[in-house]
Amino acid sequence: MACPWQFLFKIKSQKVDLTTELDINNNVRKGHQPPSSPVTQDDPKRHSPGKHGNESPQPLTGTVKTSPDPLGKLDAPPSACPRHVRIKNWGSGVTFQDTLHQKAKGDLSCKSKSCLASIMNPKSLTIGPRDKPTPPDELLPQAIEFVNQYYGSFKEAKIEEHLARVEAVTKEIETTGTYQLTGDELIFATKQAWRNAPRCIGRIQWSNLQVFDARSCSTAQEMFEHICRHVRYATNNGNIRSAITVFPQRSDGKHDFRVWNAQLIRYAGYQMPDGSIRGDPASVEFTQLCIDLGWKPKFSRFDVLPLVLQADGRDPELFEIPPDLVLEVPMEHPRYEWFQELELKWYALPAVANMLLEVGGLEFPGCPFNGWYMGTEVGVRDFCDVQRYNILEEVGRRMGLETHKLASLWKDRAVVEINVAVLHSFQKQNVTIMDHHSAAESFMKYMQNEYRSRGGCPADWIWLVPPISGSITPVFHQEMLNYILSPFYYYQVEAWKTHVWQDERRRPQRREIRFKVLIKAVFFASVLMQKAMSSRVRATILFATETGRSETLAQDLGALFSCAFNPKVLCMDQYQLSHLEEEQLLLVVTSTFGNGDSPGNGEKLKKSLLMLKELTNKFRYAVFGLGSSMYPQFCAFAHDIDQKLSQLGASQLAPTGEGDELSGQEEAFRSWAVQTFKAACEIFDVSGKHHIEIPKLYTSSVTWDPHHYRLVQDSEPLDLNKALSSMHAKPVFTMRLKSQQNLQSPKSSRTTLLVELSCEGSQAPSYLPGEHLGVFPCNQPALVQGILERVVDGPAPHQPVRLETLCENGSYWVKDKRLPPCSLSQALTHFLDITTPPTQLLLRKLAQLATEEAERQRLETLCQPSDYNKWKFTNSPTFLEVLEEFPSLRVSASFLLSQLPILKPRYYSISSSRDLRPTEIHLTVAVLTYRTRDGQGPLHHGVCSTWLSSLKPQDPVPCFVRSASGFQLPEDRSRPCILIGPGTGIAPFRSFWQQRLHEAEHKGLQGGRMTLVFGCRRPEEDHLYWEEMLEMARKGVLHEVHTAYSRLPDQPKVYVQDILRQRLAGEVLRVLHEEQGHLYVCGDVRMARDVAHSLKQLMATALSLDEEQVEDYFFQLKSQKRYHEDIFGAVFPYEMKKDGAAPSDPRAPGANRS
């Protein structure tokens, strides 16, 4: 056959038809192959090619040369200017003109009316299996085009060699129906395919690819040996080198050489019996295939999968990768020691194994290749994707972030730290990795080079922009043109979905259901479910929360109502009030915040709902409130919603439920939920309502089964900070007591301490004035010892043990994650709450442990709400007092470790400025003592305040800083402020005036007027920080100081709200209304309520506002973050009934939050 000159020369007499219809997706004329243009490419003649045969593959390398195309005249385009696409960088303003796209091969998936650019594996980038060879008339022009491209890469023209090669390829195709690439051509093709890969950000290294020619192998064993050689070379003890191994090309499609693995090294994923996934979820299907083929799984999180290799179209064979070939990097963080507890690791070599190399009409379905990692590939995609290891929320919790609030940006902060850990870990082990910023910069340099050398650069913007950092990377602002050039790496259909099995006995049984059939079945079931759900009564479930507790219960409620209704769970701030006119059933689960207010994400709905005047749709509703009965406005927001909906004409489905944090909140919710669900089924006449199977959550037994728990000896020493960090998801650190000072005079019967803590390092942790310190206290030794003396069948008090629980099916024991391994004495001292009165649920379980029948009956009686509340508020018993009241109780160590509640941290407003005291944190602590039973009962002590008062200098204090973004000094320091804080409410204001003092003396900054309103009993008894206040007033930090004394002899009681009305009415009006200033209130809930009431009266009088207008005025103040409240000091109900007074321990802002 003569040389096909028509593929080598162009007929110059052709004219360009400027009216030809264009393919708008590829910028070429439809039905017309765009003309070639000069290309600057690698010079393969500088490589050292290997020879074919049965020898080991030889490394083939090459370097880049740039020069004009010597055969450009042979491949000259028609006499018309080449069409170009202008590409702009919107960050720098630089533009490129892309002409290379005219050489694009085939069409992309996009259509004239839809863009498919974000499809993961589009058909245009995928090559499926073949059942016959490529016809010679299709193969020949592609082969000649590649040969032209190859010889066009030389610096000097080699026309005779070029023409001879074209002639040889032509004859080979005519004779055999195909042709073979030379070693140099293979090197050129693999590198050029990498250069053309639009989804790769690291192409600047394309010319440094190491090529292993394995086209001579014939068996799976030989393939395995080649791959082992590849992995060893590429890993290089961590100094990763890019490489590719090329197995024999496809012939008739029935004798393919393929690697079935997606990557040469990848972790297994196991579908466990309970539905959970252990390991990498992305590998579940392939892992099961390996098991079906005979692999023995290990069932750990990071098991390296075996290689599944197919040679010459035969059935695949399994090969375990030698462990010494797999370099793995254990993950750690440069600052967070707990990161190692996650026990994460990742393999060092990213080697894609299942793509196909297309070159000159030839297809190589087996061509595993590797580069090195960009940090985000591991830190974002592998670790944080919800369909992968999904560690983001766990890391966020351990960092102490507000993971229940999307607006807190906890995801962004956590994902950055995970990526910091990945980069740090790889670099510490001297393993090659590149951060995404450097990768983006290198791609921009590569792109400039490509436009300069060959007039274009195919690029997929969606894939090249890193998964984090977005617009702060340069690639984000770069317009890109995406097209397919040849040679090219294509995706393939998974091998196990198309393989024709020669031994049917080895075919995995799990593939008996074809994928298409399965999809159709799932789709059909989905349609049926949608129809079923659409025919059900719609139920909207709204929640408002500060800590996430209400959201959790709302989701549980949604699971219950999905058994018979069509529920939708929404946060209140996502709900449109206009939808009330369309509701059939509305359910609300909400906490109450502060002084009877709504949580932050309920404010918008609250305001809109209260302003609503009428409702034409009379739907059904039910409300459940969460809170703490220690607060006088218990569940107030929930009752406000109930009252308003009733006023609007909606019908109450069930009485408003109340979940008391101190009295069986979960049990109360479950009871209310089931009652509401049954009532809804009756009202809406749900079909089969008496036979509905409800979730196990609502039917599970509340009994204690000792056979489900056991204690096992453990030798691991207790790291207290590490344990507390893990349990509470807080970044715990240790401060040490520097000093204590009683701020009250010797005349006072009460104690208020200034606690000064010093840090172990050079500087205290970062905090702002107004923020809180969470302190982890210890229980009193006497209480701990009393309980230890009553434990039966327990280990030695100081013997470290771990609690294990029996799994649901009873087949194995698992470590209980609630507590760390520790001794019983340590658990009772540091981790378990032994002072809060037992809940009704705990009493019910204790009843099972009573050996005296009378005591058992008494405990069961106390489980009833009326008896329980009277007993609880009269005695407020500690757990030791319960054991003393019911001496026949036989309580085991496993019962204590599994059933007692967790000891919570206590929060105190920080009373110092970090700028003024960089190595210290100060607290203002009221030490709580009180007697129960109307003063006749045993003496009780506040847990944390008493513990702090007992410390000696240098004793450790485990703690953490909690943000209080709503209670900080104004960003504009010139704004005037009014500070209102009686008693220990002065605590955060001390940090305010210390900060202002530092700014004035060290930075020369003068703040706006700061007026302080303080309240106490008598000046000579409990005027806290009196001398400091006078000094701050003398230095001009405090503009004025006003004090309200409530216990002066022969004088009427004066409170802070009286000072506001009598002395500061004009100042309040100026600060809040005229000068856009700020007002801060810190103290117990009753004081905050009275202050708010007085302020509203004052402003209503001054501005002539009615009740609704003044409520809206203060709502706007809070929305503008100019009215700040830090409320603490819960009120005990039994004391409220007695005299309306109450002590306040612990300082717990937000104790009435969900």
Curated annotation (Swiss-Prot):
L-arginine binds at Q263, W372, Y373, E377. GO terms for cellular component: cortical cytoskeleton; cytosol; perinuclear region of cytoplasm; peroxisome. Heme b binds at C200, Y491. Its EC number is 1.14.13.39. Residues 539-677 form the Flavodoxin-like domain. Keywords: Calcium, Calmodulin-binding, Cytoplasm, FAD, Flavoprotein, FMN, Heme, Iron, Metal-binding, NADP, Oxidoreductase, Ubl conjugation, Zinc. (6R)-L-erythro-5,6,7,8-tetrahydrobiopterin binds at S118, R381, I462, W463, F476. It is found in: Cytoplasm, Cytosol. Its main location: cytoplasm. The keyword Transmembrane does not apply. The keyword Membrane does not apply. This is Nitric oxide synthase, inducible. It comes from Capra hircus (Goat). The lineage of its organism: Eukaryota, Metazoa, Chordata, Craniata, Vertebrata. The gene is NOS2.
